Amino acid sequence: MNFQLCKKGVELKRMFVLFSHKLTEKQERDVKESLGVLSIIYPPWEVQRILMDIPAQAENVKEIIKPVIVWLESHLTVNDYVLIQGEFGTTFLLVDMVFRKGGIPIY
């Protein structure tokens, strides 16, 4: 697992959450305990809204989720976890991108 190093040399594990709702407190505790995650990161509302509104019959999902990909690429570092759930095409594209960038997708 890859971590972001703090000034004191402590490694921080991060997890991005990419789906239509927030984790419950119990789910957040479970993630922190089971994966050692210290930081859970949600996208800004404008990115979150895109993930919530993808039509099931969308012709070009890649174009629709472009802002999601741009946001994630600008924040993702090697070995960050990314929890992904949603429309199949969106999930596939995001999982592929996370793998290519050295992240760890959970889907």
Say what each PLM segment does.
Residues 89-95:
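An aromatic- and histidine-rich active-site surface loop
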Residues 83-89:
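N-terminal glycine-rich "phosphate-gripper" loop used for MgATP/nucleotide binding
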Residues 1-80, 96, 100-107:
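Long, low-complexity, Lys/Arg-enriched
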